[in-house]
Regions:
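Pyridoxal 5′-phosphate
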Residues: 1-217
């Protein structure tokens, strides 16, 4: 079969499959101090460090999730709870569903976010959480994330970026993004389904409010 839908879900790469199988064979609670727990912790933190190195970020500021949907929801829950919300008109349903009362940022004729309109919305709602995808999952349109981040910073707003579509295909470098948080997904990059991460600016990683409360691990 000739598979032509990799931008929706990329087939599992052999290296990712081998890594996943190796992790599944590790029986241990990463929070335990016995040998099996330490081995599991090593696997977990090695993966975090590898991801951080790839995106030029700090390992301690990366939270693993079940995918970009959860990463987007976590960012909106944790960063937007006490802020007005602004989301792009063409955002993924995962963002739209997590922020039902958000103001809508229109797009231009070419499908990119209207950054003049963003400045206007932030003049009325300073300090908002703005959610903007780096690359549209249906059209492939690329937004100017750096410019959007600059506008947000000028108005005391935070920017959350859904990079599920762009991170595997473009040279995505955390140092040039200027966002408070970025969501990524494993299955868009040849990884297993059910794997993703939320990358956070250091100021927002510590004390992140969880979606679900439970044990410390």
């Amino acid at each position: 079969m000739l598979y032509l839908d990799a931008n929706a879900t990329e087939p599992l790469r052999p290296a990712a499959q081998q890594a996943a199988l190796a992790a599944m064979r590790a029986a241990g609670n990463p929070s335990s101090t016995h040998s099996a727990g330490r081995a599991a912790r090593h696997l977990l933190e090695s993966a975090r460090e590898s991801l951080a190195a790839h995106f030029h970020h700090r390992p301690q500021d990366i939270v693993f999730t079940s995918g970009a949907t959860e990463a987007n929801a976590l960012a909106i829950h944790a960063l937007g709870a006490s802020r007005p919300m602004i989301i792009g008109a063409t955002e993924h349903d995962a963002v739209r569903a997590a922020a039902p009362g958000a103001a809508i940022l229109p797009v231009l004729e070419d499908g990119t976010a209207d950054l003049d309109a963003l400045a206007g919305l932030l003049a009325v709602q300073p300090g908002a959480l703005v959610c903007l995808m780096a690359a549209n999952n249906e059209t492939g349109v690329l937004n100017d994330i750096a410019a959007a981040a600059g506008i947000c910073a000028a108005h005391g707003a935070l920017l959350h970026v859904d990079a599920a579509q762009s991170a595997p295909r473009l040279n995505f470098d955390w140092r040039t993004v200027g966002a408070a948080s970025v969501a990524i997904s494993g299955h868009k990059a040849g990884g297993p389904m059910g794997a993703g991460a939320l990358m956070l600016a250091p100021a927002y990683a510590e004390g992140l409010a969880p979606l679900q409360k439970g044990g410390g691990q």
